[in-house]
């Protein structure tokens, strides 16, 4: 295990509106406000999204299992933002549900907001963290 100690810096409250791309808006906010490290919490609803719901098996590098929906679902998620060499990289795990059906996984690609998504972002100050491709794991991993 590797770790660093930091403090909570700025706090952002964002409202992502109907039809907006949730991931693109969060990434844009990280660029605009230069959020280099942060924790985020999201809740609301999304009309469509793609999620990686786990690896096909426990191999390294993992083979992702993709799920996509377009029927509008509630969303509750948490994630982080750290930069790679050029831009912020979001890592958000969420549960989306409708009726008795739910999916849990890592949000990827375009995620269209339905009605509204509220996001709270807590900036982490005083740490030196980034994301970079881990050649062994085959994923962009947290680097401390």
Which residues are covered by each model-predicted region?
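N-terminal intrinsically disordered, cationic/polar leader segments
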Residues: 1-90, 95-144
């Amino acid at each position: 295990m590797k770790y660093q100690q930091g403090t909570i810096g700025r706090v952002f409250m964002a409202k992502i509106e109907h039809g907006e791309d949730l991931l693109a808006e969060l990434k844009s906010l990280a660029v605009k406000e230069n959020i280099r490290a942060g924790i985020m919490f999201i809740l609301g609803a999304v009309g469509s999204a793609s999620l990686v719901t786990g690896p096909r098996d426990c191999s390294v590098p993992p083979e992702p299992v993709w799920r996509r929906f377009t029927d509008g679902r509630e969303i509750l998620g948490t994630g982080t933002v750290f930069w790679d060499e050029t831009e912020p990289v979001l890592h958000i795990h969420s549960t989306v549900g409708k009726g008795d059906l739910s999916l849990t996984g890592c949000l990827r690609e375009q995620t269209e907001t339905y009605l509204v998504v509220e996001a709270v972002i807590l900036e982490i100050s005083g740490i030196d963290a980034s994301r970079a491709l881990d050649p062994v794991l085959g994923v962009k991993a947290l680097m401390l």
